Amino acid sequence: MPLTVGLISLGCPKNLVDSEIMIGHLQKAGMTMTPEPELADVMVVNTCAFIDQAKQEAIDAILDIVRARENGAYPENQKLIVAGCLSQRFRKELPALLPEVDAFIGPDQITKLPEIITQVMDRTIQDRNFIEGKCRYVPDWNTPRYRLTPPHTAYIKIAEGCNHGCAYCIIPMIRGRHRSRSQQDVVREAETLIRSGVKEICLIAQDITYYGMDKWTDARPNRRSAVDSSRGESLASLLRALNAIEGEFWIRLLYTHPAHWSDELTAAIAECPKVARYVDIPLQHISDNMLDAMQRVTDGNYIRTLLRNIRKAVPGIAIRTTFITGFPGETEDDHQELMEFIEEFRFERAGIFTFSREEGTKAYKMPNQVHHRTKARRYNEATLLLARLASETGQEQIGRQIRVLVDAPGVARTEWDAPDIDGTVSVPLTLPVGQFATVTVTDAVAYELTAE
C-alpha cells in the first residue's frame, strides 16, 4: 500500500505555496494525502518562525502530534517531519530540543520530501537534519504542485528571499538573498492557471517590487533602486505581460516595499485593467526616527508623497498596510505621529502589530526596549483608531455598486479584499461560486459588507 501523509501548513501564503509544492511531489511519488492525522503514516508540519507567536504556534502543533502518538490517538509508529522556517532558522538547535521528530527540512528541501520520507520509513537516514546552509531554491512554472486554495484563486511566488536588512526582520537570514524567476516563466504559470479556471492571481514574494532587479546587468541594484523596465525585467513589465493574457481575472499585488515604487510601476497599475485596484505596502511606521531605526530606507515625506501619487494616478485604489508599534526607542511623540498619520491617510485596509523581539535581528540588541505594558497600550490605541476608520470606510460603501468574486455560496470578496487577509461580502446564495458578479452594498460592519 502507498504511504499516507498528513500535512499541517502554518504561516503566510508564501509558506502555503511551499506546502502545495511538497504535496505535488508526494503525489508524483505515489504517496497518498490525508486530512485526518490519525490515518497518516507520516505527519509533516510546515512551520513559520517570523515572530514569537508564529514560533509558539509551530511548537504547539509539533508537540500536539507527539502527545497524540504517546496517548494512542495517532499511530505509535507514525513518523513526524518538521519543515519550513522554524527548521531553517533553528537548524542547529532543534534536533537536540525535539528528539521526537524524525527529520528536519528547510525551504530548500521541499522537492526532496518523498525521498526523505522513504529514508525515514526505511530507517536508512544517517542524520535527522537534512538542512544544508543557505536557501537557494526557486520554483518554476512546471514544478509539481497541488493547490490548497479554492479553484478560482491562486498564488504565484515570483521570487524567493530578500535583500533588505530591516532591523526587526529575520526572514533574509532564513530565506536567503532575493532570487527572481524569469518573466516568461511566471507568465507561463499564470497562463496555465487561467486556462484551468483561476480568476484571481495573487503575486507574492518577500518583496515583489524587487522582482527582476537581481538579474539587472548594467549596475547592481540597491535597497532604494526603483522599478525600472529599461534596466531589465521588473514588476511593471511583468504586470503588462500578465495583463495581456486573455481571460477575465484579477492580478493582486501583495508584499510591495515602499522604497522601490516608481512612477512607472504606478502607471502600469493604472494602465492595466486586470490589475486589482489594491496594493499591499507594509509601511511599518511614519516617524523618521523609527523608520531610520528600523532601517526601512524611507522617510516620512517620501511615504506621504508616494501615497498621494498612487491615489492620484489610480483613483479608487485600496492601499493596504501594516504598522509596528513599540519598536525599540519609540517615544510618545513617535506614536502620536503614527496615530495622526493613520487618521490623515485613512487606509482602506490596515493592520497593526506589537514589536516582537527576535534573536538574531539587529533590533534584538537595541537599547531602549519599550516596556510590554506601553507596547500593549499603544497597540490598543492604534487598534481602536483603525476599527473606527474601518467602520467609517464600510459605511461609505453602502449604496455603491461593486464587482465581487464569489468564494463560496453566499460569500464573496471585493477588489479591495485579499483572500484570508481582508474582509468579505455576504451575497445572495444564488451567485455562482468562482465567478465575478456585480452587486449593490446594503449594509456594512467595518470591512464586512452585505450586498444584493
UniProtKB/Swiss-Prot annotation:
Cofactors: [4Fe-4S] cluster
Entry annotated with the keyword Iron-sulfur: yes
Protein's UniProt keywords contain 4Fe-4S: yes
SMART domains to which the protein is assigned, alphabetical: Elp3 (SM00729)
Cellular localisation: Cytoplasm
All copies of domain TRAM, residue ranges: 395-452
Catalytic activity from the UniProt record: L-aspartate(89)-[ribosomal protein uS12]-hydrogen + (sulfur carrier)-SH + AH2 + 2 S-adenosyl-L-methionine = 3-methylsulfanyl-L-aspartate(89)-[ribosomal protein uS12]-hydrogen + (sulfur carrier)-H + 5'-deoxyadenosine + L-methionine + A + S-adenosyl-L-homocysteine + 2 H(+)
Residues given in the record as [4Fe-4S] cluster 1 binding sites: C12, C48, C85
GO CC annotation, single: cytosol
Molecular functions per Gene Ontology: 4 iron, 4 sulfur cluster binding; aspartic acid methylthiotransferase activity; metal ion binding; protein methylthiotransferase activity
Domain Radical SAM core: 148-392
E.C. designation(s): 2.8.4.4
Domain MTTase N-terminal residue range list: 3-122
Family, similarity comment: Belongs to the methylthiotransferase family. RimO subfamily.
Cross-referenced NCBIfam families: 30S ribosomal protein S12 methylthiotransferase RimO (TIGR01125), MiaB/RimO family radical SAM methylthiotransferase (TIGR00089)
Stated name of the protein: Ribosomal protein uS12 methylthiotransferase RimO
Gene that encodes the chain: rimO
